[in-house]
Amino acid sequence: MEVLAILHPILDVFDAEGVRFAHEVHPGEIAYDYWSSVRTLEAINHREAFGFNWDPSHMMWQNIDPVGFIVDFKDRIYHVDCKDTRMRPRNGRAGVMGSHLPWGDPRRGWDFVSTGHGDVPWEDSFRALEAIGYKGPISIEWEDAGMDRLHGAKEAVGYIRSLLWDLPSASFDAAFSNQ
């Protein structure tokens, strides 16, 4: 991979400075899906400075399990980017590449929508993030051609906050013990 000649010196500086780079898994990038993410980590010898910005919106339209990605790359999730995607029913005309149709056009096979209005399994995702011990930043990347941005951004923040609950202090079945 040509990009490795450029990437290794950058990662050397990041290693020296204690910086962790969160690469967004996105078409057109070196790691754009599950297997290209595996191959990229292998190609850079799993250097700790290189991890992922978990953005499930791009995984959804590529048919990648976003929760499985969290579990499989648990030590490489360096940033969480909450953006949602709504998949439209397959109709034999709309593909995953968008067909150069405008955002929000019902002929598209999918669209970005305000967080909580699409098909990303948010609760399962946040439970998986909790299970892997993720304590890093969480951002909301808001894109929705069919909703006012101020309304949508505020609503998205509230939705994500509703998923950030505290863990129980004891297992639920402890209430049934005889002690």
Q: How would you label these PLM feature ranges?
A:
Residues R149-A170:
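C-terminal helical cap(s) of enzyme catalytic domains, especially alpha/beta-barrels
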Residues P9-F21, D124-K135, L163, L167:
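A structural motif corresponding to the C-terminal end of an alpha-helix
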Residues E141, S169-Q179:
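Short, flexible loop/turn segments with low-complexity composition
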Residues F21-H23, F50-P56, Y78-C82, G136-I140:
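Hydrophobic faces of well-ordered beta-strands that scaffold small-molecule active sites
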Residues M1-F52, A174, N178:
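Active-site acidic/histidine proton-transfer and metal-coordination neighborhood
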Residues S139-R149:
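A short, acidic, flexible beta-alpha connecting loop/helix-capping segment that sits on the rim
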Residues Y34-V38, E42, M60-Y134, M147-H151:
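Gly/Pro-rich active-site loop or hairpin
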Residues P27-E29, P56-H58, D84-R86, D144:
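Active-site-proximal loop/turn and secondary-structure-junction residues that shape catalytic pockets
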